[in-house]
């Protein structure tokens, strides 16, 4: 694993990237 400068926004896939801010990852989709 590496540290990537990008993150997933609301409604975006989070199976490969973590979610931005403090969102949660549900069913591989970021949710507020």
UniProtKB/Swiss-Prot annotation:
Asked whether the UniProt record includes Plastid among its keywords, one would answer no
Keyword match Secreted: yes
According to its UniProt record, where is this protein located? Secreted
**One Gene Ontology MF term:** toxin activity
**Superkingdom to which the source organism belongs:** Eukaryota
Which cysteines pair up through disulfides? They are 7-20, 14-25, 19-30
Q: Where is the signal peptide?
A: none
Q: List the GO terms this entry assigns under cellular component, sorted alphabetically.
A: extracellular region
Q: State the domain notes.
A: The presence of a 'disulfide through disulfide knot' structurally defines this protein as a knottin.
Anything else of interest in the record?
Authors confirmed the assignment of this toxin to the M superfamily by cDNA sequencing.
Q: What is this protein called?
A: Conotoxin pr6d
* UniProt organism field: Conus parius
């Amino acid at each position: 694993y590496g540290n990537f400068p990008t993150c997933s926004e609301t409604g975006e896939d989070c199976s490969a990237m973590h979610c931005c801010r403090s969102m949660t990852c549900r069913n591989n989709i970021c949710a507020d």
